[in-house]
């Protein structure tokens, strides 16, 4: 009867079964360097007989670059970042890459630790939504990583003065144009919902909204402005229910809470 907890075969076991050195097995695994046809056949047969599969981490460490891309987001539960990861994963899969997803939890210290962990796996590139708040940012460190040859792409949050590549949204113009369009249609009693202005995207949206209102001479009461914590939908739902029960509810609601569809 086969044991339930069979010992996993190692590269040493394969080498012994094939009658070759461990370095020969390594060359077969990495397809690097000369290996005779007979030796290669024996190694492959030994791997099959022993059900040997190399550790993904060991393979990464044996190469100068892995086929893995590190991804760091600040709030893994936020729908916007989940969708971003999903799309990136589908695209990178076409090119033979796998993604390693990490959550910085909006912590500058944790973000740097995660970057170091990912670099230890010799990632091919880093895709990051950087922390950039009151604590500052890891701008200098990200630039340093880029200068050593690891591609770094910042997404969503643009850090001023950073030299890494980036994919950003013009949040100011988007919110300004949407608000301007609503006001141009004659709406004056309006409400605004968006992420809190803690990070640059939220700040830019709020600025765009206020500039459009100012241009049309419209003052929106504070009770009609809700800056939603995206990790909890309860306050946002409460705001919407409150708005709906008013004697004179807003005629239009401008929603820039990323990821939440109402």
Annotate each PLM feature.
Residues 1-67:
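N-terminal helix-turn-helix DNA-binding module of bacterial transcription factors
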Residues 109-116:
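Conserved ATP-dependent adenylate/AMP-binding module captured primarily in the ANL superfamily
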Residues 54, 63-77, 95-97:
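Interdomain hinge and pocket-entrance segments immediately C-terminal to HTH DNA-binding domains
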Residues 1-4, 17, 49, 90-98, ...:
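Bacterial carbohydrate/catabolite-sensing allosteric modules
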């Amino acid at each position: 009867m086969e044991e339930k907890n069979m010992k996993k075969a190692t590269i040493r076991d394969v080498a012994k079964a094939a009658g070759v050195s461990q370095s020969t097995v390594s060359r077969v695994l990495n397809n690097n360097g000369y290996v005779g046809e007979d030796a290669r056949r024996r190694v492959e047969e030994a791997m099959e007989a022993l059900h040997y599969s190399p550790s993904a981490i060991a393979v990464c460490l044996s190469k100068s670059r892995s086929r893995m891309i590190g991804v760091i987001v600040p709030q893994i539960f936020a729908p916007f970042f989940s969708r971003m990861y999903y799309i990136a994963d589908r695209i990178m899969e076409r090119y033979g890459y796998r993604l390693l997803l990490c959550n910085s939890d909006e912590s500058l210290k944790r973000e740097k630790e995660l970057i170091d962990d990912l670099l230890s796996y010799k990632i091919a590139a880093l895709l990051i939504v950087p922390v950039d708040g009151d604590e500052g940012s890891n701008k200098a460190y990200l630039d340093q990583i880029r200068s050593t040859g690891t591609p770094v792409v910042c997404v969503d949050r643009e850090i001023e003065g950073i030299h890494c590549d980036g994919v950003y949204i013009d949040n100011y113009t988007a919110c300004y144009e949407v608000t301007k369009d609503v006001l141009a249609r004659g709406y004056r009693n309006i409400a605004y919902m968006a992420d809190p202005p803690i990070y640059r995207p939220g700040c830019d949206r709020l600025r765009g909204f206020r500039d459009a209102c100012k241009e049309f001479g419209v003052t929106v009461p504070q009770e009609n402005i809700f800056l939603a914590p995206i990790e909890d939908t309860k306050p946002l739902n409460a705001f919407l229910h409150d708005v709906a029960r008013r004697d004179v509810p807003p005629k239009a609601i401008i929603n820039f809470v990323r990821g939440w569809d109402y």
